Amino acid sequence: MAGALAAVMVFTLAGCGTEKKDTKTGKTVSGEKVTIRILENDTAKKSGYLEVLIKSFNEAYKDKGIEAVDANMEEYTDLATNGPYGYGPDVIYQANDQIMTYAEDKHILPVEVDKLDCYEQIPKIAWDAYRIVVDGKTYYCGVPVNIQEPMLFYREDMLPENWQTNWDKDGNGTPDFFENWNDLYAYSESLRECDTSATGTEKYGFMQSLYDPYLASSFYLSYGAYIFGKNEDGTYNAADIGFSKNNAANGLKALKQFAGLMYEGCIDDTITLNRYEKIANGTYFCTVSTPDTYSLFIDKLTLQYENEGISHAIAAKKAEENLKMTELPGLMPKDGDLSKDSAGMTEDDFVNVVVMGGVNGYAISSYTKYKDACIEFVNYATGYDMVSRRTEMLGIAPAREDVAKQTGGMTDMIFKSLSEGKIYLMPSIKAVDQIWVPAQTVLGEVAKDAFNKSTGTEKYVTTEDFQKALETIDRNIYDAIFALAE
């Protein structure tokens, strides 16, 4: 397989496609206009960014015979199934793990990235998310656009009035519950205790779908766990699975503990689906999502303010002012006990938070007839102007250093976190497809166990219990990759 892939890549680097074309104009030899289909994510489409991008590109290339159009396909359309029959997109925008899964199976073309305008502006760690090694030679199969990591979203106008006196022990101007998980737990607990509604379901603190291995990654990666180990050449070793490594059991303790302040919607995707509305109406104090969903929170909050009798213009402005996005609290309790008062804890009692992240970007289908035109589009879409516009419209964290610095604030912080290793990049190998179900199953079971306490039927109590749960994840992932594939 490796030899075949190398042969395909060498061929495609020299050129691909079945129809000859004039690379200077983009037109085919017969003089026809080249039309390339672009598959973007749903957020980019709903926000109007894709329309802006395509219109801008087409204006810039109108004299070169290249036209880009919306592929009009579902965000996660299967390139492997549709591509060979000519139904797939020419250019796709997706996360690094998905693109590289396609790349391993030869559905994506490698790109000479050092010839792109964005090359020098993107850090090596982001490029490496699209790196593949075949027969000792390195290829890159995607172009980074933005950095993804789980972020905390909240409404500034929902902060407690006394946070500066009661929730800022060090007086640094940042609430303690945004700096460490013990205080986030304590504040969330206080909100639950103050919920006097008839149903007791109107006031929650921190809320998230705890079964999600990506969004809940801080509960195991912060304690020394990892997804896959690495070989000497830097490539991932899918046989070395590390969910159970080091002190990850303590992180699972914390996950179960926090689940106890939520409701059973944390064991599935219920909270992921309702988080935009629940943040907007004040039911949730804060929640976890990714930077590219910022506009979805804004839309719901704007609507909330409108429903309170404010005009759309004022509501939109108020939403922009009050919706905040910040990185997750940077400190987790070393022993996994969130109930301890942080006032009595020292620096040695905490571990630094690590989250799973990803790099979303563009890739070119192996089945396109117009590789050169696709490269022109990708080069344009990853240029300074369009990445800046994407950042402005979608609230993304750009992979380009110049745009990150220009934007400043949280965007620059996320860029720095990636460079400093605080973000564990999702492995860019096909085997990553097999981690989700085993991890979701166990994380969901552990979260649900928090609701078994009242009936005396808890399954996960001791450190050994949590360790065995994590070992189950490792074992089931291994079986899915190797034993079941035979």
Protein language model features and the residues they cover:
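Short, well-ordered beta-strand elements
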Residues: 31-43, 66-71, 91, 141
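Glycine-centered hinge/linker elements that transmit conformational signals in sensory
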Residues: 185-189, 231-272, 323-324, 328-329
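Conserved C-terminal helix/tail region of periplasmic/extracytoplasmic solute-binding proteins
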Residues: 387-388, 401-407, 416-486
